[in-house]
Swiss-Prot record:
Pfam families: ThiC_Rad_SAM (PF01964). Its cofactor is [4Fe-4S] cluster. Its EC number is 4.1.99.17. The lineage of its organism: Bacteria, Bacillati, Cyanobacteriota, Cyanophyceae, Oscillatoriophycideae. Substrate binds at residues 80, 109, 139, 175, 195-197, 236-239, 275, 302. One of its GO terms (molecular function) is carbon-carbon lyase activity. This is Phosphomethylpyrimidine synthase. Pathway: Cofactor biosynthesis; thiamine diphosphate biosynthesis. Belongs to the ThiC family. The keyword S-adenosyl-L-methionine applies.
Length: 461
């Protein structure tokens, strides 16, 4: 779809959506996004120019259906997939991608760290994906030196980053905010550093006693991103890995650096969103969102969860969806899903489904709470269908129609029950929604109540 659009931009030194927006240009991607969001296209352009919204759209990802991430638009959900050294291959990752797109992922991140040829896996995912693809290039950089972290150089990082950009990656997690002076700040934590990328860079800095090469070469990364319109997803290497560590000095020190890097990228018209925690108690979520907006000049916030408790392995799609709904309500632009396998193992396609549905619920709940235009229309339509016992319509409007139908049909599978005015919970005699009160009856009741009230007033007099 985008091949003709991007062909007109060939040869330009900066092809970012922010660059065009700041020139007053409305790109085809902006127009497409405005229609998807049901928002004025001028608003889309202005929000992108301001940096409060990004449209992740690498010029080499031509089969992309453009979308946006920002506080003015609907709350978005990302799904993580990716092969590990111990599990998965290309076909399994493509199945996860298909599952993620089917159940409404707005973006997908390929977090492959092994399982075969990483370039082959990534290019297959990009070719098959209509949604933006994000990556964490430091994983492949480490693989390129056979896991010997101390052998990594700045050129290794830049080479892999440019390769991902050439292949069509729309946004990349760049862990440029963790600095050597931040490392002593984690000494009082329970879980230390839980970011894989952050952990790699921390070990590199401790080994070499040198500053983070992604920080010192940040301007070189900006130049790559300008040429392909790759968006920064500034990684939070020092995010808390448990509720005890939330909002601590290490996390907030890195956040301040991320704000500085955000504004540095904006000076070159490169799009930025900022990643956030993690594990955060419910009473600290509002603070975290507002602090990010303050430090990062309202760049879109992209949070992992956050998990609001640490005691539910196997159910962390629930512990985190609670925090995600709250974060979305307070203004987070995109939620990174957590699956039931979090902290336990590599998710499969069914885990992707369960995690994604939990997060679609959280994002939708946030949209309703923020009174985004049309957010509740689907809820109202489903409620009407429920009251009218229109089972097929209820299934159709559900976030997961297959699961809704499956649960209904476990006990009442026959077609006749698709028109029945009850389900197996209440049966035919106890369903309260069978109590249909017509308008005439309510009018008569109102007259009676008014008359009774008047008589009582007279009696008091």
């Amino acid at each position: 779809m985008r091949a003709d659009w991007v062909a007109k931009r060939q040869g330009q030194s900066n092809v970012s959506q922010m660059h065009y927006a700041r020139q007053g240009v409305i790109t085809e991607e902006m127009d497409y996004v405005a229609k998807r969001e049901n928002l004025p296209v001028d608003l889309i352009r202005d929000e992108v120019a301001r940096g409060r919204m990004i449209i992740p759209a690498n010029i080499n990802h031509t089969n992309l259906e453009p979308m946006c991430i920002g506080i003015a638009s609907k709350c978005k959900v990302n799904a993580n997939i990716g092969a590990s050294p111990n599990s998965s291959e290309i076909n399994e990752e493509l199945a996860k991608l298909q599952q993620a797109v089917k159940y409404g992922a707005d973006t997908v991140m390929d977090l492959s760290t092994g399982g075969g040829n990483l370039d082959e896996i990534r290019t297959a995912i990009i070719k098959a994906s209509p949604v933006p693809i994000g990556t964490v290039p430091i994983y492949q950089a480490l693989e390129s030196v056979h896991g010997n972290m101390e052998n990594l150089t700045a050129n290794d990082f830049l080479h892999i980053i440019e390769k991902h950009a050439q292949q069509g990656v729309d946004y990349m997690t760049i862990h440029a905010g963790i600095l050597i002076e931040h490392l002593p700040l984690v000494k009082n934590r329970i879980t230390g550093i839980v970011s894989r990328g952050g952990g790699i860079l921390a070990r590199w800095m401790l080994h070499h006693h040198k500053q983070n090469p992604l920080y010192t070469h940040f301007d070189d990364i900006i130049e790559i991103f300008k040429r392909y319109d790759v968006s920064f997803s500034l990684g939070d290497s020092l995010r808390p890995g448990c509720t005890h560590d939330a909002s601590d000095e290490a996390q907030l020190a890195e956040l301040k650096t991320l704000g500085q890097l955000t504004r540095r990228a904006w000076e070159h018209d490169v799009q930025v969103m900022v990643e956030g925690p993690g594990h955060v108690p419910m009473d600290q979520i509002e603070f975290n969102v507002k602090k990010q907006m303050e430090e990062c000049s309202e760049a879109p916030f992209y949070v992992l969860g956050p998990l609001v408790t640490d005691i539910a392995p196997g159910y962390d799609h629930i512990t985190s969806a609670i925090g995600a709904a709250m974060a979305g309500w307070y203004g987070t632009a995109m939620l990174c899903y957590v699956t039931p396998k979090e902290h336990l193992g590599l998710p499969d396609a069914e885990d992707v489904r369960n995690g994604l549905i939990a997060y679609k619920i959280a994002a939708h709940a946030a949209d309703i709470a923020r009174h985004r235009p049309g957010a509740r229309d689907r809820d109202d339509e489903l409620s009407h269908a429920r009251y009218n016992f229109d089972w097929e319509k209820q299934f159709e409007l559900s976030l997961d129609p297959e699961r809704a139908r499956e649960y209904h049909d476990e006990t009442l599978p026959a077609d006749i029950y698709k028109t029945a005015e009850f389900c197996s919970m209440c049966g035919p005699k106890f369903c309260p929604m069978q109590t249909k009160v017509d308008a005439d009856a309510l009018t008569e009741l109102e007259k009676y109540l008014a008359s009774t009230a008047a008589k009582e007033e007279l009696a008091k007099a």
